[in-house]
Amino acid sequence: KALAQKRLKELAAYAGRNSPYYGRLYKELPEDWKLTDLPTVNKVDLMAHFDMWLTDRTVTEGAVNSFMEDRENIGRLMDGKYLIFTTSGSTGNPLVVLYDKTCMNISSALSVLRAYARREDLSAFIKKGKRTASIFAEGFYLGSGSVKYQLRRMPWKKGMMMNLDVRTPTAEIVEKLNRF
């Protein structure tokens, strides 16, 4: 618990120093603040202040939007540094999120841990050819974007990984999975 609190304090201090948006929000925090003392934020406010909440001051909403106009950029690094993802917008307010290499590595590790939490699942995966198929919405979303990123980084995995668009008719998804 102490380590988690220390890391949270470091993260909040970093955000406060490097993001004008969070710097303003965190300015009045007491010295001995707890997680519940942090002001809440929402997607609408974050997108309205996009250029102010990012901690990398070189990234702008205009540059991100320009990058996202080309669907060939799905799974590519913007400026050689960031994968760009969006939330689905199911609430009517999609949020654009940037992942650096560290964030992507942590996300990938957590995905593997969740997928193969049981030893028998990992054993079956190894025995049956080490192939994975995922069904995500196609676009700049975390699921499909991260699969495309992995395939760009490791093209030799092309026959081992597949992403199917969730909006594809079910019969077509089943056919593709059976062929895979």
Model-derived segments and spans:
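Conserved adenylate-forming
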Residues: 10, 17, 137-180
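Nucleotide 5′-phosphate-binding alpha/beta core
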Residues: 1-86, 93-131, 138
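Glycine-centered flexibility sites
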Residues: 89-92, 143
